[in-house]
Amino acid sequence: MTLNDVPVRFDADAHTYTMVDGTVLSGVTGLLKERLFPTQYAGVDPEVLNNAAAYGSAVHRMCEAYDTVGAYPENEDLHAYVGVKNEYELEHLCSEYLVSDCEKYASCIDKVYEVDDNTVDIADIKTTYRLDKEYVSWQLSVYAYLFEKVNPCIKVRNLYAIHIKKGVGKLVQVERKDVIAVEGLLYTTEPMNVDPYAMPSKWREREDELIKYTHLMEVYKRKVEDI
């Protein structure tokens, strides 16, 4: 399978996307922060964020080196990634694949995995303490939309987060947002239609704890009723 290229240059140091005619494009992560997740890391110490970013970048580089040239240093996080790939039989096609609408936006997809001659899965590697599945869902939904614009004969099947932390790797499938929602995010300034019953982000980050707490409360309630 051969993927199409876009006339966009990515400067990794400055993290900028520029078309060959000089037009500067916006990245998807900045858009998500501005439109949907403005308080995602509010209150977090900048040093903590910087350390987390450095750790995440190191893991990304190791995974890319493994997929592209077979480099396999002794590292628990790389072992976790390789374990996920082997368990789910992910066939690496491309890393850091650049997609764009060539009008306003461009971004690099961490991983593209080949499914068959005209189908791929895409994935983003996350190294955060807790995985924000709603964020990844939006991020990869936009990536899938742009991917299919660049490659109209290839369909994106599944969207995955590959969550790696302290030597443990998990493959988590996330929902793909519909095209209307994605285009609304990309090309309108209207407020996003947010589900009023959706879990607030600060609670979503503690979802596992809340589920455990809810279960314990149900057990306690049954015990009280039995008295």
Language model features with spans:
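Short polybasic amphipathic segments
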Residues: H15-M19, A161-H163, D226-I227
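A residue-level signal for conserved active-site and pocket-lining positions in enzyme catalytic cores
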Residues: V59-H60, K111, Y143, Y213
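DNA replication initiation modules
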Residues: M192-P200
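Mg2+/Mn2+-dependent nuclease catalytic core
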Residues: L93-P191
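Contiguous, amphipathic alpha-helical segments that mediate oligomerization or scaffolding
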Residues: M199-I227
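Conserved aromatic-histidine-acidic binding/catalytic patches
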Residues: E47, N51, L131-Y135, S201
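Metal-dependent nuclease catalytic cores that hydrolyze phosphodiester bonds in DNA/RNA
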Residues: M1-A106
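Hydrophobic/aromatic-lined pockets within catalytic cores
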Residues: D67, E148-P152, E218-K221, E225
